[in-house]
Amino acid sequence: MISKEQKQKIITEFGKNPNDTGSVEVQIALITDRIRYLTEHLRSNKKDHSSKRGLLKLVGQRRNLLRYYQKKNLEAYRTLIAKLGLRK
């Protein structure tokens, strides 16, 4: 799981202020971090089907948020994708 310190670091990096947890950028960054954690977990635990299902749900949630953000603000979307290192 993501530690509190790591979560706070992501919030301060992507948020507008240190308490900004609801903005789209922060949500996408936090979900991306959880996806990376679960991907590593599933590499060593191949038969953990409940975690795999959770990973697929997170990927879908992130995809929906990215689609919304792309429609809302294309330039900021592109910078966010580059910052997170996502392929788009």
Curated annotation (Swiss-Prot):
It comes from the Bacteria. Part of the 30S ribosomal subunit. Forms a bridge to the 50S subunit in the 70S ribosome, contacting the 23S rRNA. InterPro entries: Ribosomal_uS15 (IPR000589), Ribosomal_uS15_bac-type (IPR005290), uS15_NS1_RNA-bd_sf (IPR009068). Gene3D superfamilies: 6.10.250.3130, S15/NS1, RNA-binding (1.10.287.10). Belongs to the universal ribosomal protein uS15 family. The keyword Aminoacyl-tRNA synthetase does not apply. SMART domains: Ribosomal_S15. One of the primary rRNA binding proteins, it binds directly to 16S rRNA where it helps nucleate assembly of the platform of the 30S subunit by binding and bridging several RNA helices of the 16S rRNA. Forms an intersubunit bridge (bridge B4) with the 23S rRNA of the 50S subunit in the ribosome. The gene is rpsO. Keywords: Ribonucleoprotein, Ribosomal protein, RNA-binding, rRNA-binding. Pfam families: Ribosomal_S15. GO terms for biological process: translation. It comes from Borrelia turicatae (strain 91E135). This is Small ribosomal subunit protein uS15. GO terms for cellular component: cytosolic small ribosomal subunit. GO terms for molecular function: rRNA binding; structural constituent of ribosome.
